[in-house]
Amino acid sequence: MKPIPQTEAELLQRANQIAGCSFAELAEEANMDVPLDLKRDKGWVGQLLEWHLGAPAGSKPQQDFSELGIELKSIPVSYSGKPLETTFVCVAPLTGVHGLTWETSHVRNKLSRVLWIPVEGEREIPLAERHVGTPLLWSPNDEEEILLKNDWEELMEMIVFGQFDQISARHGVALHLRPKAANSKALTEAYNINGKPIKTLPRGFYLRTQFTAQILQNAFNSLLNEE
């Protein structure tokens, strides 16, 4: 792994250095094998980018670059630059949730400063031939923060009241909640609507593609304005 970057500028410089490179080129330098596809290696792209950017490995409550307060997120995009899938933020707490606030939440911590790295994601492009795009450092503006906060508070209220069967993909404008488990047997503890302990699937917070598409579009527009 490359050394941990000491400044935001150093991290961004590294991200710019790998922009335009193929996964094959990056994997060769990192001495990593390129899988045929991502069905069994969903975290492979993230691990490859972490190696090149110097992120300490592992999924943690704090940001990937905790010393810099920056979270790393790869984002698979289509030929037209639109996100192809929702973006995982963090696991949702299902117990001990009374008294939690947006200001101290893991979601807000993770999204306070994000290094977005678009990557080619069209399935017809062999994994080894996919390329890394231009990086983007982002923090939510006031409008985005309000959207995220409102969604988080609505979803957490449903968790507090044990309304798991009522939470659907329709809830949330920018952020939504959905099961996160490799299989349906991986159950975790929670409380139902009557306050009784139950077992349910772990849930994760995800950013909707419409929200991340707007982030990328805004960045692209600001680049055009600079030119």
UniProtKB/Swiss-Prot annotation:
GO CC terms, sorted: cytoplasm
Similarity remark: Belongs to the MutH family.
Naturally occurring in which organism (per UniProt): Vibrio vulnificus (strain YJ016)
Record keywords: Cytoplasm, DNA damage, DNA repair, Endonuclease, Hydrolase, Nuclease
Parts forming coiled coils: none
Listed GO MF terms: DNA binding; endonuclease activity
One Pfam short name: MutH
Major subcellular site: cytoplasm
Function: Sequence-specific endonuclease that cleaves unmethylated GATC sequences. It is involved in DNA mismatch repair.
Descriptive protein name: DNA mismatch repair protein MutH
Gene: mutH
Keyword presence, DNA damage: yes
Subcellular location: Cytoplasm
One biological process term in Gene Ontology: DNA modification
